[in-house]
Amino acid sequence: MFALDAVICNTDRHFGNFGFFIDSKTNKIIAPAPLFDHGNSLFNYAGEDDFASEKALSVYADTLLPCVYDDFIGTAKAVLTAEHKEGLRKLLNFRFKRHSRYNLSPKYLALIEKQVRERARRLLEK
């Protein structure tokens, strides 16, 4: 959860939008529930000026903070597992699959793709 939120800059992860599957007989945690509520991510509130360039979007991304912990990258790095790192390595070549009719502008998509790749790279740095 922390790694994904760091990659997509999900500013709205809070204690009401993640959970766990619980064994009803033992009342023990079985597994984390699937993640949901990623609506405040991928620079959805960024303005036209923020999408003016790769640098501008990077500066904007660095102003975003998670809702209930201190920072995206540091918190995610503290809990990364080998499995997380494997997934992050796959994001180093990330590209959105374009829909035939519904897309942001090619410029916006390219800038967001670069941010996803860069944020994955930052998480993998030692």
Predicted regions located by residue number:
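Anionic ligand-binding catalytic core segments
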Residues: M1-N10, F15, G19-K126
